[in-house]
Amino acid sequence: MSRTLVLVRHGQSEWNLKNLFTGWRDPGLTEQGHAEAKAAGQRLKAAGLKFDIAYTSALSRAQVTCQHILDELGQPGLETIRDQALNERDYGDLSGLNKDDARAKWGEEQVHIWRRSYDVPPPGGESLKDTGARVWPYYLHTIQPHVLREETVLVAAHGNSLRTLIMALDGLTPEQILKQELNTGVPIIYRLNADSTVASKEILSA
């Protein structure tokens, strides 16, 4: 038995490809995104993993990624919990804008602050700190108990919602987590100790 948590950022979305701020908007996956999600499932299968339960956000790009992974593992009907607590960071007024257009409107420095500061939200949106304030409690109260019961748990979500989990699990500072990029469709496997600390971490790159 193992206490295993697998985090996967969704495959490339249509708006990732167009360089748009996405947040809580709900574009689908590109062909590449579908392929990335299926490949993630294949790598997890090769690693010998099977899941006891899956969690994903309320957004289709994460849900479809989750389903592709489960299909590849031969677990298409696995219990899957969908919750907006795992949604991407809400970019507020930036949502739907091309990143270059946002820089033209507000200035490169201001947009950089909104994107890469820990606690400064864009207008009408969330900071990374705000995102963590909903993601981490949800993890502690809902997801972690399954892991500590020696289950294997999948979380298919988003770059910033997963970044806040990684920050807490790895004990990183805001400065450290802001420098980390999460590639689309790449599984991160955590094995936890009985006291919920991290025993090991493995990134299943292609």
From Swiss-Prot:
Which SMART domains does the annotation name? PGAM (SM00855)
Q: Name one Pfam family in it.
A: His_Phos_1
Keywords of this entry? Gluconeogenesis, Glycolysis, Isomerase
Record-listed E.C. numbers:
5.4.2.11
Q: Where is this site: Transition state stabilizer?
A: H158
Give me the reactions it catalyses. (2R)-2-phosphoglycerate = (2R)-3-phosphoglycerate
According to its UniProt record, which residues of this chain constitute the active site?
Answer: H10, E88
Q: Please give one Gene Ontology molecular function term for this protein.
A: phosphoglycerate mutase activity
Q: Which PROSITE patterns match?
A: PG_MUTASE
Pathway it acts in? Carbohydrate degradation; glycolysis; pyruvate from D-glyceraldehyde 3-phosphate: step 3/5
Annotated residues for binding of substrate: 9-16, 22-23, 61, 88-91, 99, 115-116, 159-160
Look up keyword Membrane and say if it applies.
Answer: no
SUPFAM superfamilies from the entry?
Answer: Phosphoglycerate mutase-like
An example GO BP is: glycolytic process
Q: Read off the PANTHER family from this record.
A: PHOSPHOGLYCERATE MUTASE
How does this chain assemble? Homodimer.
In the record, the note on similarity to other proteins reads: Belongs to the phosphoglycerate mutase family. BPG-dependent PGAM subfamily.
Function, as annotated, reads: Catalyzes the interconversion of 2-phosphoglycerate and 3-phosphoglycerate.
Give the protein's recorded name.
2,3-bisphosphoglycerate-dependent phosphoglycerate mutase
